[in-house]
């Protein structure tokens, strides 16, 4: 897939808006995980709620940083997860703001430049914003299922929930 600089900038405007619309919803789900439930696991193969939260946070920031850098670094943990949901939510908010500011500063040519994704695919940088969004939504959905199963407050996402009806 090839994009001109102008096409990449137009697509970026659309996709950045999507990421910035979804991020506050993800933040709301992260904040809803009770601190005393961080060890909760849904099923034998599930991650702990805390591990799932930290993976979501780090991955979203990793995508934004990789897009801005024009290359995806080897995925490695950036330290231990913060102790509380509040601290994790703050880390998400800060990291996403910084990463997306870098993406917004990219030129059309930078947005159009292909990035190799582990020799699986090579797409224009801007298209990975959709991967960021999809990945975040996927794990946010998992976390909302954890919240319901642990009998915690489930925030509204696109419409009302039993705990936050419209």
Regions found by a protein language model. Give the residues of each.
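Short, contiguous alpha-helical
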Residues: 2, 16-30, 37-78, 116-166
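Short, low-complexity N-terminal intrinsically disordered segments enriched in polar/charged residues
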Residues: 2-13
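Exposed loop/turn and edge beta-strand positions of beta-sandwich/beta-sheet ligand-binding modules
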Residues: 9, 43, 82
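Hydrophobic packing residues in well-ordered alpha-helices of helical domains and bundles
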Residues: 15, 19, 85-92, 96, ...
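Amphipathic, well-packed alpha-helical segments that form the structural scaffold of globular domains
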Residues: 27, 31-34, 100, 104
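Acidic catalytic patch
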Residues: 36, 104-119
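Helix-adjacent hinge/juxtasegments
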Residues: 65-106
